[in-house]
Amino acid sequence: MSAIVDIIGREVLDSRGNPTVECDVLLESGVMGRAAVPSGASTGSREAIELRDGDKSRYLGKGVLKAVEHINTEISEAIMGLDASEQAFLDRTLIDLDGTENKSRLGANAMLAVSMAVAKAAAEEAGLPLYRYFGGSGAMQMPVPMMNIVNGGAHANNSLDIQEFMVMPVGQSSFREALRCGAEIFHALKKILADKGMSTAVGDEGGFAPNFASNEECLNTILSAIEQAGYKAGEDVLLALDCAASEFYKDGKYHLEGEGLQLSSEDFANYLANLADKFPIVSIEDGMHESDWAGWKALTDKLGKKVQLVGDDLFVTNTKILKEGIEKGIANSILIKINQIGTLTETFAAIEMAKRAGYTAVISHRSGETEDSTIADIAVGTNAGQIKTGSLSRSDRMAKYNQLLRIEEDLGDIASYPGKSAFYNLR
């Protein structure tokens, strides 16, 4: 019987040393599910609300004891005795209990921890790996990783305005080989930076954060690392950017302070199109401010046929906003962050809506992570085809990559690696 008999919430620390929420869910049969939630640095204004205590005497106000208390009292009372295998009903119970549009009463961090822990307990009870529990017998596609090897913007203390410079190994026949490719490029880049006397310290997501003079210098250095690692850019490996443009949009202009530029939406769209012409860039995330829908439309009209344009702050894993974007022809892909929306059921609904509209879905970590690897199972369980979970260092990032290695091994001969076909909506 998969009835829930005990729920325990607790405060633990994330990869940045900030508190986050962990939850254990115990079932009548004795099996347990445990989940910990991540936390973002650059956040969309319409994300579900992460409940923090605001008590400056503890953890600089970032404690999560209120969220934990909600798990141990109200949430526990509401779902005790429910069947853990009824995920949609359970998540709806949490949503109704919270009663707000943005989960600000109970906290999306409290709700998500419970939602994930319940799913893990139910999978354990069913004797299934989590990815199989999520996706059934059709779950067999490994994701192409977006590997964030250079950090800028809000993730680093340097002069790069673009937040993430990523490599995507697409010319390999398996996830295992793709991971090796990414790791070899990471180490080649480290040597290049060290030889130039540049910093090889890593940022929140495990990428390097050196002081490049410009975005183009950074991209050219990454191309050199790809070549030195023995791979061909444009064939074996493609590039991806996360502009996080909301972070440098002020008074209607895009301020690239590192390059001394102030650009209109149209000029910034041209700037990105120029980069995409010069470099093998296949994906650009948050290329415009989350509220600059006219800019997004211009960017989509200009690049949407040949570059994956991913909405993160734009869509915040929210089906209402995604639906509007689809209707208006804005972007062609959605970034999926489980803590932006706060339950697994709503997360899966966003992935499904994107796929039906011919948009791609990229499953993503946050900059503040834990050892929890649920997103790896979500990526395979939904056959998403892409995952974004950091660079090739820091064990909070490796936890997801290593889980994907285990899943690929478990799948055996039926595992498929999509490579370039992950971008099924590009020409």
UniProtKB/Swiss-Prot annotation:
Class of enzymatic activity (EC top level): lyase
The keyword Lyase appears for this protein: yes
Subcellular location: Cytoplasm; Secreted; Cell surface
Molecular functions per Gene Ontology: magnesium ion binding; phosphopyruvate hydratase activity
Cofactor or coenzyme needed: Mg(2+)
GO biological process assignments: glycolytic process
Active site: residue positions: 205, 337
UniProt catalytic activity: (2R)-2-phosphoglycerate = phosphoenolpyruvate + H2O
Entries under InterPro entries matching the protein: Enolase, Enolase-like_C_sf, Enolase-like_N, Enolase_C, Enolase_CS, Enolase_N
Annotated Mg(2+) binding sites: 242, 285, 312
Keywords attached to this entry: Cytoplasm, Glycolysis, Lyase, Magnesium, Metal-binding, Secreted
GO CC annotations, alphabetized: cell surface; extracellular region; phosphopyruvate hydratase complex
Binding site for (2R)-2-phosphoglycerate: 163, 337, 366-367, 388
Cofactor note: Binds a second Mg(2+) ion via substrate during catalysis.
Taxonomic superkingdom: Bacteria
EC number: 4.2.1.11
Pathways involved: Carbohydrate degradation; glycolysis; pyruvate from D-glyceraldehyde 3-phosphate: step 4/5
Family in the record: Belongs to the enolase family.
Record PANTHER family: ENOLASE
Known function: Catalyzes the reversible conversion of 2-phosphoglycerate (2-PG) into phosphoenolpyruvate (PEP). It is essential for the degradation of carbohydrates via glycolysis.
Protein name, as recorded: Enolase
The encoding gene: eno
